[in-house]
Regions:
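Divalent-metal (often Zn2+) His-rich catalytic cores of metallo-beta-lactamase-fold enzymes
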Residues: 39-59, 330, 349-410, 414-449, ...
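C-terminal segment of N-terminal export signals and the immediately downstream linker at the start
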Residues: 1, 22-45
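Conserved beta-strand hairpin/beta-sheet module of binuclear metal-dependent hydrolase folds
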Residues: 125-185, 310-315, 319-325
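Metallo-beta-lactamase
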Residues: 134, 158-169, 221, 226-404
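N-terminal export signals
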Residues: 6-28
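Feature captures hydrophobic
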Residues: 33-36, 481-496, 500-507, 512, ...
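Active-site metal-binding motif and surrounding structural segment of the metallo-beta-lactamase
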Residues: 157-158, 168-219
Length: 620
């Protein structure tokens, strides 16, 4: 019987590797690196470096293995253009720039860049189209005004809006462009939130007045339990999540060939005001059909897929299938680097399969909250089947390896997307990557522990790193060896030891600069924008410090105001530092007259604030 180590070593993908166009380039192979130590004049940072020979070789290999002959995405993304976005900048009400497409114009000036993976460059060029598009008569989209798309469906009395972007300023600008060319002055007659992520509801105040919602004039429709999961996923860990977004989304990383080039889902996240108006109607059943402003719609609830609560929508009279964010032009996240509960890829696959057989066999157009539509039943079925198989394979094959002993710290060097799916552009990793998604599958089923007792109660990095530095002979020896590994193109090995030095000596700027050089080369090599952004944003911080600038805030006061009282009290319990409340004892009974809620909050132990819905005898 083989040991786990022998089994892993026998696999064709063994070793530290990068997935490149359907095959792997091992870190120690000749396909990686030259010395890149001289600052690059064209770089946005004075310490920035050019791609090394090893990085150039990785990108060259990628170009030869990608399915560039398939041009269908290029035709689909430009189909139906009515009007482009004339002003490439959208200002926030607070006075700063909320959205700027001008900074991405460099992408269209060259066919290739030696610091951008060719597959990622292709995706960023596709996302560089912006404006108002006709999907079919009666359905329109504004794309390129935010990370997500906003869609308009013609109703009996007005326009039904699907997913009103991230911030009110971009949603308002999209609505203005739409009204100038198509809207005919008709109002918003309904709003549909497809799911709980902020880029699908945050701009609602840019298109509808809350008074019209509360009066019943404009219904806001969402999947069941929308508010609970919106708050738990976007607000409870909002501060930590917003910090992690700096890496995954490169929020303050300069846009340039050596920096930020897009986010895969769209070009970026707008930096305006996020708002939330609570839904007035929930889709509760697995399949629920009703009219929205005279348009018959069939809603398919898909809980625990791309989001904790999400729904697809089919419009039978138009043969139009809205797949929310369950099907996009990319592999999505099973585990998202910004942080969120790990998603269920098998469940996700099954709901895509259900949509295929319920609606996809007759649909003639499929559109979603990101990217571009697909036209024709054959094309729709191709995409649905491919994405269904992608998530099922990832779930099943990762667990197959896990059951043979591959751990969470090894699976990313073992799992590969099947060759037949790698050759489909819509299965490439422009949001989720095979590396971090495969680890997410193991985390979902087995948790973080790799069965090595050493990792059960590990020292914190700042505590363990000084010992490593001591045992390796001190800082200078690590610097010398780290530079040598860097110059040999062995970047993953180099980061392993130089990171120890930075953790042990956080003020050692020479060590931070070397680690930044290592991260930079790794970033250039990535097809996945989340991985690229994380490496390059980290390099930027190591060289400069934490950047400052305007970003969207998922825990904004407006979002907090939309909470129920119980959700707000839960949030208050998280914000409270229990260490400062030792010895305190209290009970608060609450009645909120505007909605009749009755709650009790208790602090009777030195541990936590607990809240529950009650009918108190003597509320105060």
């Amino acid at each position: 019987m083989s040991t786990r180590r022998q089994f892993i070593q026998s696999l064709p993908a063994a070793g530290t590797a990068f997935a490149v166009a359907g095959h792997l380039v091992l870190e120690d192979s000749p396909a990686l690196g030259q010395v890149a130590t001289v600052p690059l004049k064209e770089h946005f940072h004075p310490k920035g470096k050019a791609p090394s020979k090893y990085t150039l070789d990785v990108l060259k290999q990628a170009r030869t293995g990608l399915p560039f002959a398939d041009q269908r995405d290029l035709d689909e993304q430009k189909r139906g253009l009515i009007a482009p976005m004339k002003d490439l900048k959208i200002m926030a009400d607070a006075g700063h720039v909320a959205w700027d497409m001008e900074r991405f114009q460099f992408l269209d000036k060259q066919d290739e860049f030696d610091s951008i993976h060719p597959s990622l460059l292709r995706q960023s060029k596709l996302n560089n189209n912006y404006g108002l598009y006709e999907v079919i008569p009666g359905i329109y989209q504004v794309r390129g005004f935010d990370l997500s798309d906003i869609s308009f469906v013609r109703g009996k009395t007005g326009w039904i809006v699907f997913d009103p972007l991230v911030t009110k300023e971009t949603a308002r600008a999209a609505w203005k462009l739409f009204q100038q060319h198509v809207g005919q002055g008709m109002p918003v007659s309904a709003v549909i939130y497809s799911h709980t992520h902020g880029d699908h509801w945050g701009g609602v105040r840019g298109i509808v007045d809350e008074a019209d919602v509360r009066s019943g004039k404009v219904p806001v429709i969402a999947p069941i339990d929308f508010m609970d999961f919106t708050i738990s996923e976007n607000v409870y860990a909002g501060n930590a999540m917003n910090r992690r977004l700096f890496y995954q989304y490169g929020l303050l990383l300069p846009a340039s060939p050596h920096g930020y080039v897009g986010q895969g889902l769209g070009q970026a996240v707008s930096a305006g005001a996020i708002g939330l108006i609570a839904p007035t109607r929930y889709v509760e059943k697995a399949i629920e059909e009703f009219e929205v402003d005279g348009v018959r719609m069939v809603f398919q609830n898909t809980p625990n897929t791309e989001a904790p609560r999400e729904m697809n929508t089919y419009i039978p009279e138009m043969k139009a299938l809205w797949m929310a964010e369950n099907v996009i032009a990319s592999l999505h996240n099973i585990y998202t680097l910004r942080g969120a509960p790990v998603r269920d890829p098998l469940n996700w696959s099954k709901y895509i399969g259900e949509a295929l057989f319920r609606f996809g066999l007759e649909a003639e157009v499929m559109f979603a909250s990101h990217h571009w539509p697909r036209w024709g039943n054959d094309r729709i079925q191709e995409v649905l089947r491919g994405q269904r198989d992608l998530y099922a394979h990832m779930n099943n094959q990762v667990l197959h390896f896990a059951n043979q002993g591959v751990t969470i710290n090894e699976i990313h060097n073992v799992y590969e997307v099947p060759k037949g799916l790698q050759n489909k552009w819509f299965c490439r990793g422009y949001h989720g990557s095979p590396q971090h998604n495969s680890r997410g599958v193991i985390q979902r089923y087995l948790g973080f522990w790799d069965c090595n007792p050493t990792t059960l109660i590990p020292l914190s990095p700042g505590e363990s790193a000084p010992l490593y530095v001591e045992m390796m002979g001190g800082a200078q020896k690590i610097m010398d060896r780290g530079r040598q590994l860097h110059d040999e193109g062995r970047y993953l090995h180099a980061q392993e030891i130089v990171n120890k030095l930075v953790q042990a000596e956080p003020q050692n700027q020479a060590a931070k600069d070397l680690l930044a050089d290592i991260f930079e080369q790794l970033g250039y090599q990535q097809e996945n924008p989340g991985l690229r952004n994380s490496y390059l944003a980290a390099a930027y911080e190591l060289r400069t410090g934490i950047p400052q600038g305007e970003t969207a805030n998922s825990s904004s006061p407006d979002v907090i105001r939309a909470m129920s009282t119980e959700l707000f009290l839960n949030f208050l319990g998280i914000r409270m530092d229990s260490r400062k409340a030792e010895g305190m004892r209290f009970t608060i009974n609450l009645i909120t007259p505007d909605n009749g809620e009755k709650l009790s909050s208790n602090w009777k132990t030195p541990h936590s604030l607990t809240s529950r819905v009650i009918k108190p005898k003597n509320p105060t």
